[in-house]
From Swiss-Prot:
It is found in: Cytoplasm, Cytoskeleton, Microtubule organizing center, Centrosome; Cytoplasm; Nucleus. It comes from Salmo salar (Atlantic salmon). GO terms for biological process: translation. GO terms for cellular component: centrosome; cytoplasm; nucleus; ribonucleoprotein complex; ribosome. Keywords: Cytoplasm, Cytoskeleton, Nucleus, Ribonucleoprotein, Ribosomal protein. Residues 18-44 are annotated as: Disordered. InterPro entries: Ribosomal_eS7. Component of the small ribosomal subunit. The keyword Nuclease does not apply. This is Small ribosomal subunit protein eS7. The gene is rps7. Its main location: cytoplasm. Residues 18-34 have a biased composition (Basic residues). The lineage of its organism: Eukaryota, Metazoa, Chordata, Craniata, Vertebrata. Component of the small ribosomal subunit. The ribosome is a large ribonucleoprotein complex responsible for the synthesis of proteins in the cell. Required for rRNA maturation. One of its GO terms (molecular function) is structural constituent of ribosome.
């Protein structure tokens, strides 16, 4: 389950436009786990 979730997250990350990606990197520095959890919930 985890590997598939991470794989889907990576796909979403590549699809995202540049500005969103930039803000996401900024948020990742603050709290990578909560950011990932939010993305997972959105995917579900």
């Amino acid at each position: 389950n985890w590997s598939s979730l991470i794989f889907s997250l990576n796909l979403q990350r590549r699809i995202l436009p540049k500005p969103t990606r930039k803000s996401r990197i900024k948020n990742k520095q603050k709290r990578p786990r909560s950011r990932t959890l939010t993305a997972v919930h959105d995917a579900i």
